[in-house]
Regions:
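Active-site neighborhoods and metal-handling regions in enzymes and metal-associated proteins
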Residues: 1-400
Length: 400
């Protein structure tokens, strides 16, 4: 077996262990990212993993490319003949007179496709397997961590180049263009994938002054105002001014894997209260880092951060402002930006070695902007390791 094949086998084995625990007979993978994770190919189709026996990737397009890429056996997909083909290739699951329990990640499955699957497989009982896939993908392998380290290195190099362009009068979008071009030349895909329905995200945000405090639909503390209501997030044409906070939040996708980082910059000098708030963001980061270790409930870093924000007298500004505050401190990240674990109240599951996640303590001040920091980490056997390479500091640039 090749290294890729061994990786796919290990992932499939973990999926099957979770299926056995839930008495699932077969798992239908439909989301492009899930299909890639388990097959090694992101061609359009449905990968079916039986609890026993050979998995098969039924491909709509392109069968030719899937045959070259997929670790699973590939077959052309036709929903008209799907039931017959499933019975032929997986008789232990799809035998006549049996009511198999089938799972799919409902959070990433269109109603239209689900209805067609129900029509094609009328005898099946369906169950939501969203949590199953999230659990399996939450713990990263050595190969995945290698891709994440490459991503972090590319982001750091691009950020350093982008920093050289920041000066009074330059537009947010021009800074973002420098950073994005530098990342693209180094292997960034140009996209970051999100699992959340109806969500999309640009490569990054450069948000200066009040742009950093502009609320929007995106489930994050700072999104930028963007160009237009049709894209209400990201950098804008607004010119950077002296003595205002500039938040640079960038994601970089290398070999499919995303890292996320944020730094706060000022040309000149920040107001004293904003400098103090930034100091609290770093303090929250340091305290939360201590809690990134195996066995700690996902919610604990969030609850500790909220307590510190309260002590600072800044709770109304923490992770957004007022009704637009988000209710998390960090998020899992990998092939998608919004993976497990979620550092938020109510998530009592324990952290495990190999989980990759962000911490992003940020404070938002309406009409003035946002300050804060974000890094990507991996949970280790004894604590955590910061994958982000960029130095943790408030970046102060001279007026020129």
């Amino acid at each position: 077996l090749t290294a890729v094949d061994r990786e796919i086998v290990a992932r499939t084995d973990r999926l099957r262990a979770a299926m056995r625990a839930r008495r699932i007979d077969a798992f239908f993978l439909t989301r492009n990212v899930d299909v890639y994770y388990f097959t090694g190919s992101m061609q359009n189709g449905i990968a079916v993993v039986p609890v026993e026996g050979e998995p098969v990737f039924w491909v709509r397009r392109s069968v030719t490319r899937a045959e070259k890429e997929s670790a699973f056996r590939t077959k052309p997909l036709s929903l008209r003949t799907f039931e017959r083909e499933l019975a032929e290739h997986m008789p232990e699951v799809f035998v006549s007179g049996r009511r198999p329990v089938l799972a799919a990640a409902f959070e990433a499955l269109s109603a239209q496709l689900f209805m067609r699957l129900q029509e094609a497989l009328p005898s099946a009982e369906w169950t939501d397997g969203s949590a199953v896939v999230r659990e399996v993908r939450a713990v990263k392998s050595a190969a995945e961590l290698a891709a994440l380290r490459q991503s972090a290195a590319v982001a750091d190099e691009a950020f350093r180049e982008g920093l050289k362009s920041i000066r009074e009068g330059i537009a947010e979008i021009d800074v973002m263009a420098v950073i994005e071009a530098q990342m693209r030349r180094r292997g960034h895909f140009g996209v970051m994938r999100m699992r959340a329905y109806n969500h999309e995200i640009p490569t990054g945000v450069v948000a200066a002054g009040e742009s950093g405090a502009e609320p929007t639909y995106f489930d994050g503390p700072v999104a930028g105002c963007g160009f237009h209501p049709a894209m209400p997030q990201g950098a804008s044409f607004r010119a950077i001014r002296r003595n205002e906070p500039i938040m640079v939040d960038i994601g970089c996708t290398v070999e499919g894997y995303v890292t996320d980082q944020t730094r706060t910059i000022v040309v000149g000098e920040l107001d004293a209260d904003l400098r103090e708030a930034y100091g609290w963001a770093e303090r929250i980061m340091r305290e939360a880092e201590k809690l990134l270790r195996p066995g700690v409930p996902w919610e604990e870093p969030y609850l500790a951060a909220m307590a510190l924000a309260e002590r600072a007298g800044l709770s109304d500004h923490f992770m957004g402002f007022g009704a637009d505050r988000v209710k998390f401190l960090g998020h899992g990240i990998g092939l998608e930006v919004d993976e497990w674990p979620v550092l938020a109240k109510g998530f009592a599951q324990p952290l495990e070695p190999g989980m990759v996640l962000t911490l992003e303590p940020k404070f938002v001040f309406p009409g003035r902007g946002a300050v804060g920091i974000e890094n990507t980490y991996v949970v280790t056997k004894n604590g955590c390791e910061k994958l982000t390479l960029t130095e943790d500091r408030l970046v102060v640039l001279p007026i020129r």
